[in-house]
Amino acid sequence: MKMIVIADDFTGSNDTGVQLAKKGARTEVMLSASQKPSRRADVLVINTESRAMPADQAASAVYAALSPWCETSPAPLVYKKIDSTFRGNIGAEVTAAMRASQRKLAVIAAAIPAAGRTTLEGKCLVNGVPLLETEFASDPKTPIVSSRIAEIVALQSEIPVYEVFLQDVRRGGLSALLTAYAAEGEGIIVVDAVEERDLTLIAQAACEQPSMPLLVGAAGLANALPVELFMQDRQRLPVLVVAGSMSEATRRQVDNALCRGRAEVVDIDAARMVSDSAEQEIASVVEQACALLSQHRHTILRTSRRAEDRQLIDALCEKSAMSRQQLGERLSQRLGVVTLNIIEQARIGGLFLTGGDIATAVAGALGAEGYRIQSEVAPCIPCGTFVNSEIDDLPVITKAGGFGSDSTLCDALYYIEEMYCGD
């Protein structure tokens, strides 16, 4: 996640989010802070629906929605979306966002020149008319009391508010001013913008700061942001292969991929994995797999290396006091846990699952409610996505253990590589 946008209403979430999406960012709008976003999102837009709330409730909503995302490392870029006509709890929400993101400065540039919203000499103008003289002043839910933005902000914030006028923006002085304000402590900086180029200059000045300020604006400033601020590098991510089948076909496919240097393998001790003290084996497998995936290597979890492993099942059943069915179910369930743990710690580009029991167990561990089939990699080997799962719309290829030629696994890895470049 590269960027978090906190908006106070749904349509505002969307009109700002689309500025980033149209430049190629994977942008997701959440209607509630409790929702779980996609692992592949570049930009997360959270709607607090707080515009008409009492100021203290709005501040609490913003802080609660934003603070968990600012505890990660590296911290994402934070953008506080506000109404371009300054309706709502501007001061309270900006202050809460500064506290949650631990930013000393907030830069407010809510102009949208293409929509007739501009800022000149610290005042909000709508098609050239001061805000207080427009219909927005008498908004039934959130009326406006001033055209001067600093006055609106100061009504709900004790943080000092400064104004930077157009001439300073256009002569290139904004960056130095922001640095100077930061040296004085906390500050909210209201910046003039009349044309799109002014917003570009504001974005550039913000990027030049040693510590990125909280950006506060509407669709206009969002559109002016350079893409490297909110888009992750596109790269092919490794595939996690869970080879739980003991079939000869699956063994040949795994061996073929290893011989061709297409993947690395983590061998699983089935006896340890099904034991009552499997935690150590699970932790070891997860650690090894994550290390390989972090090196962008396709990684295979293998439960059977040799044909004679099949002959050991009866002995393992006797030792574990389980039937073949019980043993298979426990192994599948534990592999599901392993897969979930790996996915929580590593970035992957897709899943390849061999064996029906394994595929079912992994789907369950990931919380999938179904499987959406999209295409066929090879005869009887589909590619699709799990529905409402922990891995969103990452490709998942499933294969019955005995299906496929020796090259099927390599073909599947190539297929996923060509489909996705990851997040």
From Swiss-Prot:
<keyword id="KW-0067">ATP-binding</keyword>
<keyword id="KW-0418">Kinase</keyword>
<feature type="binding site">
    <location>
        <begin position="355"/>
        <end position="358"/>
    </location>
    <ligand>
        <name>ATP</name>
    </ligand>
</feature>
<dbReference type="InterPro" id="IPR037051">
    <property type="entry name" value="4-carb_acid_sugar_kinase_N_sf"/>
</dbReference>
<dbReference type="InterPro" id="IPR042213">
    <property type="entry name" value="NBD_C_sf"/>
</dbReference>
<keyword id="KW-0808">Transferase</keyword>
<feature type="binding site">
    <location>
        <position position="9"/>
    </location>
    <ligand>
        <name>substrate</name>
    </ligand>
</feature>
<feature type="binding site">
    <location>
        <position position="51"/>
    </location>
    <ligand>
        <name>substrate</name>
    </ligand>
</feature>
<protein>
    <recommendedName>
        <fullName>D-threonate kinase</fullName>
        <ecNumber>2.7.1.219</ecNumber>
    </recommendedName>
</protein>
<feature type="binding site">
    <location>
        <begin position="81"/>
        <end position="84"/>
    </location>
    <ligand>
        <name>substrate</name>
    </ligand>
</feature>
<dbReference type="InterPro" id="IPR031475">
    <property type="entry name" value="NBD_C"/>
</dbReference>
<keyword id="KW-0547">Nucleotide-binding</keyword>
<comment type="function">
    <text>Catalyzes the ATP-dependent phosphorylation of D-threonate to D-threonate 4-phosphate. Can also phosphorylate 4-hydroxy-L-threonine, with lower efficiency. This side reaction may serve to deal with the toxicity of 4-hydroxy-L-threonine by converting it into 4-hydroxy-L-threonine 4-phosphate, a useful product that can be used by PdxA2.</text>
</comment>
<feature type="binding site">
    <location>
        <position position="401"/>
    </location>
    <ligand>
        <name>ATP</name>
    </ligand>
</feature>
<keyword id="KW-0119">Carbohydrate metabolism</keyword>
<feature type="binding site">
    <location>
        <position position="245"/>
    </location>
    <ligand>
        <name>ATP</name>
    </ligand>
</feature>
<dbReference type="GO" id="GO:0005524">
    <property type="term" value="F:ATP binding"/>
</dbReference>
<dbReference type="GO" id="GO:0016301">
    <property type="term" value="F:kinase activity"/>
</dbReference>
<dbReference type="InterPro" id="IPR010737">
    <property type="entry name" value="4-carb_acid_sugar_kinase_N"/>
</dbReference>
<dbReference type="Pfam" id="PF17042">
    <property type="entry name" value="NBD_C"/>
</dbReference>
<comment type="similarity">
    <text>Belongs to the four-carbon acid sugar kinase family.</text>
</comment>
<dbReference type="Pfam" id="PF07005">
    <property type="entry name" value="SBD_N"/>
</dbReference>
